Amino acid sequence: MIYQGETLSVSYLENGIAELRFDAPGSVNKLDRATLLSLSEAIAALQQQADLKGLILTSGKDAFIVGADITEFLELFDLPQEDLLGWLKKANDIFSAIEDLPVPTLSAIKGHALGGGCETILSTDFRLADTSAKIGLPETKLGIMPGFGGTVRLPRVIGADNALEWITTGKDYRADDALKVGAIDAVVAPDALHSAAVQMMKDAIAGKLNWQSRRAAKKAPLRLSKLEAMMSFSTAAGMVAAVAGKHYPAPMTAVKTVEAAAGMSRDEALVVEAQGFIKLAKTDVAKALVGIFLNDQHIKALAKKAAKQAAKATRHAAVLGAGIMGGGIAYQSASKGIPAVMKDINEKALALGMGEATKLLNGQLEKGRIDGIKMGQVLSAITPTLSYDNVKHVDLVVEAVVENPKVKAAVLGEVEGIIGDDAVLASNTSTIPISLLAKGLKRPQNFCGMHFFNPVHRMPLVEIIRGEQTSDETINRVVAYAAAMGKSPVVVNDCPGFFVNRVLFPYFFGFNKLVADGADFAAVDKVMEKEFGWPMGPAYLLDVVGIDTGHHAGDVMAQGFPARMSKEGRTAIDVMYDASRFGQKNGKGFYAYEQDKKGKPKKVADVAAYELLAPIAKPKQDFDKEAIIAGMMIPMINEVVLCLEEGIVATPAEADIALVYGLGFPPFRGGVFRYLDTIGLDRYVAMADQYADLGPLYRVSDRLREMAAQGKTFY
């Protein structure tokens, strides 16, 4: 044994070939600070080995190294700039020391080698992967960029164009795709990885593979002419500007870093990379995106805990109500290995549901994500039926019929009499209180809400709603089922609109108010999209969701919270609804819709919408972006805070994940609570107070005012 640490060890295999094996105590290998220290000590020990002829990096886990330890990031980002630079330099000295060993080096890669894991393998001369390998640099998704030499070594290994695509998109690549661009040198079967790595190393030691020239290229300036450099970097910058936009600085900073370091040696280029990394690490965007990752991990941990505590796992499920939504839920369940019965009273609805599942699977097939066998397996795991016979023995039923309390109550009561006493019932409802639906049930403890978002296959959030009598066992089983479906379940307590819709409608209230005061709805959309960062502005969102749906939900919210959410006369949404302008579904809403070349709806301005709104609005006036953002966001933020105070949602982390995953709250802002911490509670309260005369939704709670006065934060 040359070296033994807690997370890695070094020992000789044969003939002077040493193996550095990453094998942390947990389920995965991470490059945390402790592992970096061990790696430094291990390389120092190797440097003293007179008999060393070659080094192979391996992993004792299913994955090579999944990346740096992101739980350490926020603490690191808060370090003074000099200390952060010192940490980066020490880390990079380790990878440079691997690269500078006087013997050939090779990485034997299985599973994920991401982020710091990818940068580790780039420090070796050769990279051999098995078919399970996935390689990539996802740092830009966290608002930062590679900091352990990724922007320096990858362009010198696979060329500037390929490297810029890898770094700016943050995608991970399968072994065969990585092989095509030269990121790895060969791909072998998993059971051949070790023997192939040893043989490859023997060939390098024998001089059959020129490891010295490989290494020299990585340490030298990029081989690009002035014209090639100009074309590569200007093209990359243009694409990044179009895709990432101004709110996500990491991809553009990465492009500029690679460009600035193109003519430099390795050591000079690493200094430039460190400067870019630190610049990004100090941004609010990085803290927000890392915060989302950590919140997501928190949600996953809660779901794992629920699965452990559940007395029974869901092996068979049923969906009541087919169509697009029911078909989407059945598909999601079946695609994750949980067979689903899809029951409806209408043959056409069943055909629509199966059609939806088939369409989604065809999309996966065309992208090469599944093969025909997998498609057949998933489709055969969905059983469409007009009768309850196949529903009798399922573990869990998701009711997904029309959003009508009477219809839902009737269906729930009917199916409860058919399923087993320990089977769980869940209602996919967006606004109807769960405790109301539970009133007609004999086993209300086995019932909860399970609110999916449309489209089901794409939206990660599922709201799990606890009714007054819902048992912990029911919640645990439904949370575990949602997680098994690949979703992010957030448990909320029962109230009109639950959490997501309850906080969305104050936002629409703000929209109605702005339009009534003379704002141009298209200008409001533009500000909320381009400046605040929502994927869609409020008018466009209403058109996409359906103005009839929004109108109905708005009435439910007004009844549920009359003191705050009752209407002040006819609203912009009322006007569109009364004119039967329901949005994309019938081609006219706030905008008119035409089909683009792909047959998808494309919005265009429509004078008729403005004419309809004129009687309920003051004369048109321009609002600056600050006034529009304040008018839209203060009602939502205040309602989110109230939901936390009332215990509707348990933690700021769960609230922020629900907002980002369920509503598309701008990820670079991290969610409402991260946003409040970023701008400062005192500053927010002062801003909201300027709008307090607009109504109850604009008035901050006493608790929030108290927190602001005490200088507190939510995280």
UniProtKB/Swiss-Prot annotation:
Q: Where is this site: Important for catalytic activity?
A: 119, 139
Alphabetically ordered keywords of this record: Fatty acid metabolism, Isomerase, Lipid degradation, Lipid metabolism, Lyase, Multifunctional enzyme, NAD, Oxidoreductase
Q: Which organism is it from?
A: Aeromonas salmonicida (strain A449)
Record's NCBIfam families? Answer: FadB, PRK11730.1
Q: What is its EC number?
A: 4.2.1.17, 5.1.2.3, 5.3.3.8, 1.1.1.35
Q: How does it assemble?
A: Heterotetramer of two alpha chains (FadB) and two beta chains (FadA).
Ranges for region Enoyl-CoA hydratase/isomerase? 1-189
* Residues involved in NAD(+) binding: 325, 344, 401-403, 408, 430, 454
Q: Which residue ranges does the record annotate as region 3-hydroxyacyl-CoA dehydrogenase? A: 311-715
User: What GO biological process terms are annotated to this protein in UniProt?
Assistant: fatty acid beta-oxidation
A GO molecular function assigned to this protein is: NAD+ binding
GO cellular component terms, A-Z: fatty acid beta-oxidation multienzyme complex
Q: Which residues form the active site?
A: 451
Q: What is this protein called?
A: Fatty acid oxidation complex subunit alpha
Please state which protein family the record places this protein in: In the N-terminal section; belongs to the enoyl-CoA hydratase/isomerase family. In the C-terminal section; belongs to the 3-hydroxyacyl-CoA dehydrogenase family.
Q: Which residues bind substrate?
A: 296, 501, 661
Report the catalytic activity.
a (3S)-3-hydroxyacyl-CoA + NAD(+) = a 3-oxoacyl-CoA + NADH + H(+); a (3S)-3-hydroxyacyl-CoA = a (2E)-enoyl-CoA + H2O; a 4-saturated-(3S)-3-hydroxyacyl-CoA = a (3E)-enoyl-CoA + H2O; (3S)-3-hydroxybutanoyl-CoA = (3R)-3-hydroxybutanoyl-CoA
Recorded hits in PANTHER family, A to Z, give: TRIFUNCTIONAL ENZYME SUBUNIT ALPHA, TRIFUNCTIONAL ENZYME SUBUNIT ALPHA, MITOCHONDRIAL
Please describe what this protein does. Answer: Involved in the aerobic and anaerobic degradation of long-chain fatty acids via beta-oxidation cycle. Catalyzes the formation of 3-oxoacyl-CoA from enoyl-CoA via L-3-hydroxyacyl-CoA. It can also use D-3-hydroxyacyl-CoA and cis-3-enoyl-CoA as substrate.
TM stretches of this protein: none
Superkingdom, taxonomy of origin: Bacteria
